[in-house]
Amino acid sequence: MALPNQQTVDYPSFKLVIVGDGGTGKTTFVKRHLTGEFEKKYEPTIGVEVHPLDFFTNCGKIRFYCWDTAGQEKFGGLRDGYYIHGQCAIIMFDVTARLTYKNVPTWHRDLCRVCENIPIVLCGNKVDVKNRQVKAKQVTFHRKKNLQYYEISAKSNYNFEKPFLYLARKLAGDGNLHFVESPALAPPEVHIDLAAQALHEEELQQAANQPLPDDDDEAFE
């Protein structure tokens, strides 16, 4: 869903809402996609910036109109107008700030109150930073709510496309859909230790086979 003053397209397009605490890297993440950054539009009445992000798939071009809060979440809850007609969502937290993960259930509740039964991806951002506070095995919320989870690093472009590919497959109802061309991304601002991150990803896989804790707080003990 584009803004009233924004160009529409004749290929499939979807409203993607991105939520999470302030400072988790939502805007940085969206701005990696250079053509979307060039064509963004701001809507002051809702306090939102909408970035049109195009991806090229084996089934043709698709567009996500990424609704970014432009920092409004720092002043309390978001208005329902931000969520209405949302067709998919990303909930983002910062793996270096434990509170941002503890607030994920609140964001999920607010989102699902307005947007029922939409595909949602949970993203743990800033995995390039050394002093990680939320370990991979401590991330369990997605398993409780049947969400997809990815570890990402917006500033290094690590796993940038994965949330979009997952959502595209869900929205198209085609598990074989794939991207045939990479979007133009801003050059990495930082470099990620891929060997260390591979260990986190392995920890995540092992945790998926463990029983869920009764309470998320238990995971941090």
From Swiss-Prot:
Region feature Switch-I, mapped onto this chain: 40-48
GO biological process, one term: ribosomal subunit export from nucleus
GO molecular function: GTP binding; GTPase activity
Region (Switch-II): 71-87
One Pfam family recorded for the sequence: Ras
Keyword Ion transport included in the entry's annotation: no
Gene3D superfamilies per the UniProt record, alphabetical: P-loop containing nucleotide triphosphate hydrolases
Domain of life: Eukaryota
SMART domains: RAB (SM00175), RAN (SM00176), RAS (SM00173), RHO (SM00174)
Subcellular localization(s) per the UniProt record: Nucleus
Disulfide bonds: none
Domain Small GTPase Ran-type: 10-174
Keywords: GTP-binding, Nucleotide-binding, Nucleus, Protein transport, Transport
Residues binding GTP: 21-28, 71, 125-128, 153-155
GO cellular component: cytoplasm; nucleus
Similarity annotation: Belongs to the small GTPase superfamily. Ran family.
NCBIfam families, per database record: small_GTP (TIGR00231)
Function: GTP-binding protein involved in nucleocytoplasmic transport. Required for the import of protein into the nucleus and also for RNA export. Involved in chromatin condensation and control of cell cycle.
Protein name (record): GTP-binding nuclear protein Ran1
